[in-house]
Regions:
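Bacterial N-terminal signal peptides that target proteins for export
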Residues: 1-7
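Sec/Tat signal peptide C-region and signal peptidase I cleavage site
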Residues: 15-21
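Cleavable N-terminal signal peptides
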Residues: 8-9, 19
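Exposed acidic/polar residues on beta-strands and adjacent loops within beta-sheet cores, strongest
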Residues: 21-174
Length: 174
């Protein structure tokens, strides 16, 4: 009986670590962070605890959005840069993106944009040109969220405009 208990304990210790691993375990600054995140299980604990656990990465939770019943996006500051993860309902990181720097004059956006005056069917993640007081604002860089494939897909910003209401930069892009 003791041998069986010892064997079970050894199996648990050998396999238990991967079961509790999250997307930040084994992550290192200076590596291909999106590639390292994809396919990993998302951390599911309190953000404060995750930030503390991975302090060496400069980890900071920046918020998230529910894209659909099947998919969420979560923004993290990792190693001094912002990354966005697409996480499925099972908690797997399906895609990750290094998000460009954004500011008051180049605000971050998430939502529905227009091309030629018509709403696009996909949710767009973008950096906008906030140098004017116009609404909607033109797009500098953008990705659509392919909900079926759970991927970020680059899209041309040419002729694309997005309303100020979807700006997610803290200062609102004003």
């Amino acid at each position: 009986m003791t041998k069986l208990a010892g064997l079970l304990a050894a199996i648990f210790l050998a396999w238990g670590q991967p079961a509790f691993a999250d997307e930040f375990q084994n992550l290192q600054c200076g590596t291909d962070i999106p590639k390292a995140l994809i396919g990993k299980r998302s951390s599911n604990g309190p953000i404060v605890e995750t930030e503390k656990k991975y302090r060496a990465l400069g980890l900071k939770g920046l918020g998230g959005d529910e894209i659909s019943d099947q998919l969420s996006s979560v923004n993290w500051l990792i190693c001094g840069a912002e990354y966005v993860e697409l996480i499925d309902r099972r908690g797997l990181v399906r895609d990750a993106l290094l998000f460009p720097p954004h500011s008051k004059t180049a605000p971050a956006f998430s939502g529905i944009c227009q091309a030629k005056g018509r709403d696009l069917p996909d949710i767009i993640l973008a950096v906008l040109d906030g140098s004017t007081a116009a609404d909607p604002l033109p797009v500098k860089t953008a990705w659509k969220i392919d909900q079926k494939g759970a991927k970020f897909v680059p899209v041309s910003g040419e002729g694309l405009t997005c309303p100020r209401g979807g700006i997610i930069t803290l200062d609102g892009g004003r």
